[in-house]
């Protein structure tokens, strides 16, 4: 199993948009697992209740910094882009490129 760092949108303007982004990220994680990969999606882990609040700027920055540190453990960053390319994903791309990590763009079949 190869390690992959999973990038997909998280933040949203409404609770519904965030919930849809979480649903999408979970589907992306399942896609990685079906491909025989071991994905890590820090935006799903660090935003759980009682951990960090994404809507609080300092906490979002802390979570992103921790996630980007973990991303160095994987030789590949996979970006799922059916729901767009968020500001956080842009930063993730910059970090991946700065560390010479391979970047792969993906879409989920049948995702609307």
Stretches with model-predicted labels:
Residues 1-112:
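Catalytic phosphate/metal-binding cores of nucleic-acid and nucleotide-processing enzymes, i.e., regions
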């Amino acid at each position: 199993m190869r390690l992959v760092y999973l990038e997909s949108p998280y933040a949203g303007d409404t609770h519904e948009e965030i919930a849809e982004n979480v649903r999408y990220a979970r589907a992306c994680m399942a896609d990685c697992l079906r491909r025989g990969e071991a994905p890590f999606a820090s935006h799903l882990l660090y935003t759980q209740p009682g951990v960090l609040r994404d809507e609080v700027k300092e906490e979002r920055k802390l979570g992103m910094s921790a996630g980007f540190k973990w991303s160095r453990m994987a030789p590949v960053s996979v970006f799922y882009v059916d729901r767009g390319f968020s500001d956080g994903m842009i930063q993730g791309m910059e970090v991946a490129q700065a560390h010479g990590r391979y970047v792969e763009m993906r879409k989920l079949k049948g995702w609307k």
